[in-house]
């Protein structure tokens, strides 16, 4: 049991590192490609990699039972919108702040679950979510590092859409293999990204830019790191309880800070640092009951 949990913890740490690397590469390409193009290139590369792997490690592509397609389509759409909003913020603000906005998903999950899943909202979870919302307000200061109204809206939406994707994943387990969900997401986002590239969407899509020689490397690395991150994430949740894995996901903010500083981001000021700290504390408090419950079983 302990070895399995240790393996799961190792997997989530590797997943967060890979996602941090992917975000850094997206920031590098953001000067040339629009957020929509980055979504397409990330997704199409991931799709091709998954199709190459499939013959060596096949899995069931058809649903276990009827009724799951609409849920899968919804997961693709909200997951894609989350990625699009996140990629926009990677271009405009520091990597740490963009990642912190995205990692607010558990906060919104607490608030949305009673509405969407009819789950009872515990007082402790509500207090934890409120702490996180204070953190969101602190990092949403327009006077800090060019965080304007659009960036704030995109940041909040990225967290909400990730939250909706997580909520949907709970139901999808009954209908599809986990790997099939990953492939469907990558393929669906490739189609949406391709279509979006040819539509002029303010802030998000500015036409098609033909990849230069140096861009081929960055595009490949975005796809490879994103695919590895998704695989490590899947194996983490397959080998260790979610209550133990979920709190460790917040190390993604640390990687966002480190890679952002390396790429030229300025260090967060006191107010933004406090906001990130409150978001971290909020997420840990939300996950704490499940964490303690799982630790008692060891």
Swiss-Prot record:
SUPFAM superfamilies: Multidrug resistance efflux transporter EmrE. Keywords: Cell membrane, Membrane, Repeat, Transmembrane, Transmembrane helix, Transport. It is a multi-pass membrane protein. Signal peptide: none annotated. The keyword Iron does not apply. One of its GO terms (cellular component) is plasma membrane. It is found in: Cell membrane. Gene3D superfamilies: 1.10.3730.20. It holds the Pfam family EamA. The keyword Hydrolase does not apply. Belongs to the EamA transporter family. This is Uncharacterized transporter jhp_1155. It comes from Helicobacter pylori (strain J99 / ATCC 700824) (Campylobacter pylori J99).
């Amino acid at each position: 049991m302990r070895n399995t949990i240790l393996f799961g913890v190792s997997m989530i740490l590797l997943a967060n590192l890979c996602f941090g690397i992917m975000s850094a590469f997206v920031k590098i390409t953001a000067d040339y490609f629009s957020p929509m193009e980055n979504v397409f290139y990330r997704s199409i590369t991931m799709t091709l990699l998954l199709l190459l792997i499939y013959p060596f490690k096949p899995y069931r592509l058809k649903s276990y039972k009827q009724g799951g397609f609409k849920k899968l389509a919804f997961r693709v759409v909200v997951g894609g919108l989350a990625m699009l909003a996140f990629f926009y913020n990677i271009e405009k603000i520091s990597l740490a702040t963009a990642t912190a906005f995205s990692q607010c998903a558990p906060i919104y999950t607490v608030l949305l679950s009673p509405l969407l899943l009819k789950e009872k909202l515990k007082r402790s979870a509500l207090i934890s979510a409120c702490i996180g919302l204070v953190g969101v307000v602190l990092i949403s200061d327009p006077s800090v590092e060019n965080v304007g109204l659009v960036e704030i809206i995109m940041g909040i939406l990225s967290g909400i859409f990730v939250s909706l994707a997580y909520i949907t994943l709970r139901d999808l387990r009954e209908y599809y293999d986990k790997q099939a969900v990953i492939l469907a997401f990558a393929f669906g986002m490739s189609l949406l990204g391709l279509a979006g590239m040819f539509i002029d969407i303010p802030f998000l899509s500015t036409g098609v830019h033909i990849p230069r020689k140096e861009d081929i490397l960055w595009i490949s690395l975005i796809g490879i790191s994103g695919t590895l991150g998704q695989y490590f994430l899947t194996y983490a949740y397959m080998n260790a309880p979610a209550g133990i894995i979920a709190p460790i996901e917040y190390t993604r903010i640390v990687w966002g800070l480190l890679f952002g500083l390396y790429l030229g981001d300025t260090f967060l000021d006191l107010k933004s640092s406090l906001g990130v700290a409150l978001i971290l504390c909020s997420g840990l408090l939300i996950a704490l009951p499940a964490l303690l419950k799982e630790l008692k079983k060891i």
